[in-house]
Design a protein with these regions (language model features):
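Active-site loop segments of alpha/beta catalytic cores
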Residues: 1-24, 28, 78-313
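Helix-coil boundary/capping segments in enzymes
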Residues: 28-93, 98
Length: 313
């Protein structure tokens, strides 16, 4: 068929007929930048969360939480999502150019629902609120979901083919809360936030680090298009593949720890092992399960050489 890389990617994540397994290093995306979404430095976002970068070349972390007590929710003002999308004429021109070049346009939002709630409240405060103040927790999460829904609407209006966001739900061993809490508090709000994106048949790229194998079936059931990064040391990737085949694509799964400290032979063997599990039937984008600038170049080179060698369908 001689598909373009972007067309091949779409065939793969839709469980169609890709010519090869897509790879994370392919130049097929244009990233649409929205203003005041996230900065690498010390800053205060539109929610009133103060971010501090404790070490150079790392991500800042929420240090001041504007709503530590959820019983004060009535006094807390949710920001206007449209404020992220002012003065976008230059970005519109870039989107038009990217689409003319055959690229897919991706637009991302940092700190989606769970992450946004705990950034606003503080992690411990929010987890306690889920148990002690469930009604107020539902109200807060619905407010955040409606904010996100409007953000996604704006992204689509600007021409986004894919929406992405960070929503780390897992620790190394399990979810940060019970699966029951996930289904009660979070899954209904995902449905609200994704409504327009699903109607527009655009791609939902869901990012969650940690162990998420207990909820991947639910993410697939609400039509999440793709899940990343599938941390291999936190999840049973065979189990996840069985659950998501023909339902939800997977991206990542190549052990980042091994990429950092392993030999090229170990990297090749691990990449081949993961490809053997995740490639069959489509729906897999081969990439590291975390992004680090310190990866030895020879290991990254081996990863993608192996992916090319073993990637044909």
């Amino acid at each position: 068929m001689n598909l373009s890389p972007a067309q091949n990617f779409l065939e793969a994540i839709r469980f169609g007929s890709p010519e090869y397994m897509p790879r994370g290093n392919e130049d097929i995306f244009h990233t649409l930048q929205i203003k005041n979404n996230f900065f690498y430095g010390n800053w205060t976002d539109q929610w009133g969360v103060n971010w501090v970068m404790d070490m150079p070349d790392t991500s800042p972390f929420p240090k001041v939480n504007p709503l530590p007590d959820i019983t004060k929710l009535d006094d807390y003002k949710i920001p206007n999502p449209d404020d992220l999308f002012t003065d976008m004429d230059e970005e519109k021109r870039k989107v038009k150019k990217a689409k003319a070049e055959g690229k897919l346009v991706i637009c991302g939002m940092s700190y989606f629902l769970f992450e946004r709630a705990w950034a606003v409240m503080g992690l411990e405060n929010f987890l306690v609120a889920l148990i002690e103040e469930p009604e107020l927790s539902h109200i807060l999460l619905r407010k955040i979901a409606l904010y996100a829904k409007r953000v996604f609407e704006n992204m689509l209006e600007l021409g986004a083919d894919m929406i992405s966001f960070s929503e780390d739900l897992g620790t190394q061993r399990a979810l940060a809360f019970s699966p029951e809490h996930f289904h009660e508090f979070f899954l209904p709000e995902y449905r609200v936030a994704f409504e327009d994106t699903l109607k527009a048949k655009k791609i939902i790229n869901f990012h969650s680090c940690g162990c998420v194998e207990s909820i991947v079936h639910s993410l697939a059931d609400i039509n999440v298009s793709m899940l990343n990064p599938i941390q291999s040391r936190a999840n049973d990737i065979k189990k996840i593949k069985e659950i998501t085949t023909n339902k939800m694509a997977l991206s990542g799964a190549i052990d980042s720890h091994l990429l950092l400290v392993g030999t090229t032979k170990e990297v090749r063997d691990e990449t081949a092992r993961v490809i053997e599990i995740l490639k069959p039937g489509g729906g897999y984008i081969c990439a590291p399960d975390q992004g680090f600038p310190e990866y030895p170049p020879e290991n990254i080179d081996m990863l993608y050489k192996t992916a090319v060698e073993l990637g044909r369908y």
